[in-house]
UniProtKB/Swiss-Prot annotation:
Entry protein name: GDT1-like protein 3
Signal sequence residues: 1-25
Keywords: Membrane, Signal, Transmembrane, Transmembrane helix
Any one cellular-component term (Gene Ontology): membrane
Length: 293
């Protein structure tokens, strides 16, 4: 009744209530705005953190790919591998067809199982290829690359000129080939190659396999194809040289075993010597004008 009877007090109380309500409403609005801003900043921070994490993940993947690329070094080594493979493969073809190892495989395949003769000859040639490639990689560590490249150039030129000289002097290639086949056949019939090494390992390998292995190994040791393989490995990719030489030996020996003496007698040694001489001279020119870096 007092408030109703006194209008002034009633107006004052209403004014105070209105002010308090306004202030509390403004406080709630401010709190809501602050809450929204904090949530927005939290989302922004989370988004930035996710972006940063993604960037770190991408950078890690890129680094891993880069490290893998550096380890593999495919772009840098692929051309040298194929170049060495082609060089060694072509070199073996022109030096081994009609050679003593070729004739040994051909004559033995006429009297013994072809698979055994082929496996023994290829085993010896693969071992010789690995040894020759290893020697070619060891020599540059003992002698400077410049001197090894010069020696390879001289060897290529020597073999090229020698093969061209053989081609020039070959007046009757068929008779010479027949004579060489008769000489090799005499060696086989005389039992040459029966050494203590053969007797030691004869208990582990068949006599035919061992005979093919030893005769091929001894005939290939010091041959021009072995020396050329060593020379190639001094300045070309060793893996490519080994693979190319192995493929070349496989092709030549397989032809010898399958074709036998007929194939050996039909091949013109003058043609083979001419092609081989030109190929070795090409190796010499390439080694001289384009030395390894």
């Amino acid at each position: 009744m007092g408030l109703i009877s006194n209008p002034t007090r009633l107006i004052l109380v209403a004014t105070i209530f209105f002010l308090v309500s306004s202030i509390s409403g403004q406080d709630s609005v401010v709190e809501n705005n602050e809450r929204q801003e904090s949530e927005g900043s939290g989302k922004e921070l989370g988004r930035r953190g996710m972006v940063g994490t993604e960037r770190i993940g991408v950078d890690t993947v890129v680094d891993n790919i880069g490290a893998l690329g550096l380890n593999l070094d495919l772009d840098a080594t692929a051309p040298s591998v194929f170049d060495a493979l082609f060089s060694s493969f072509s070199m073996i073809l022109v030096t081994e067809i009609g050679d003593e190892t070729f004739i040994i495989a051909a004559l033995m395949a006429m009297r013994h199982p072809k698979a055994t003769v082929l496996s023994g000859a290829l085993s010896a040639l693969f071992v010789m290829t690995i040894l020759s490639t290893g020697l070619g990689r060891i020599v540059p560590n003992l002698i400077s690359r410049k001197h090894t490249n010069s020696a390879a150039t001289v060897l290529y030129a020597f073999f090229g000129l020698r093969l061209l000289y053989i081609a020039w002097r070959s007046t009757d290639s068929k008779s010479n080939q027949k004579k060489e086949m008769e000489e090799v056949e005499e060696k086989l019939e005389s039992g040459q190659g029966k050494t203590p090494f053969r007797r030691l390992f004869s208990r582990f390998c068949t006599p035919i396999f061992l005979e093919s292995f030893i005769l091929t190994f001894l005939a290939e040791w010091g041959d021009r194809s072995q020396i050329a393989t060593i020379a190639l490995a001094t300045h070309k990719n060793a893996i490519g040289v080994a693979i190319g030489a192995s493929i070349g030996h496989t092709v030549c020996t397989s032809l010898a075993v399958v074709g036998g003496s007929m194939l050996a007698s039909r091949i013109s040694q003058r043609t083979v010597a001419t092609v081989g001489g030109l190929l070795f001279l090409g190796f010499s020119v390439s080694s001289y004008f384009y030395p390894p870096l």
